Amino acid sequence: MLADKKIVKVEVSKEHLKTLNEASTLLISCVDFRLIDETDKLMKQLGLEDDFDKVSLPGASLALVNEKYTHWGKTIEDTIEILQDLHNIKQIIFLDHRECGAYKKLIAEERLSTKEKETEAHTEILNKARKIIKEKFPQLKVYTFLMGLDGVIEQIYERHPADC
């Protein structure tokens, strides 16, 4: 089916977007195909429909902090840098999700063995990602979320040393 398509025309659903030059937010989410619609619904609920750019890499926040695929982190940082100039972004949203294959592959399986342990692993990595972004881009706000495959989304708040 794909091989025989030379030109494809899709309907332009939002003609008014052609004139926009700014997006307030960069969403960094996982590549997982199971949550594409839910991710769009979240951004709409946050009032950010038509006001965000998106980068998708395996593991979302894990892409920034993992030690095996460090080029993913560089990609995120380079993207933030250019989008500050191109679209004047003001905030970053990391959207991790439960039952993530990248997490299963890149961190110890026992850290994901219960819902509580999985939440703790995501919280730790989301907070590491937040810290990296705040150090390199102190002018940007950083928000972190964890989505379940059931569509339930929890905001993960910044941890301070006293909280540990």
From Swiss-Prot:
InterPro entries: Carbonic_anhydrase_sf, Pro_CA_2. It comes from the Bacteria. Gene3D superfamilies: Carbonic anhydrase. GO terms for molecular function: carbonate dehydratase activity; zinc ion binding. This is Uncharacterized protein RBE_0009. It comes from Rickettsia bellii (strain RML369-C).
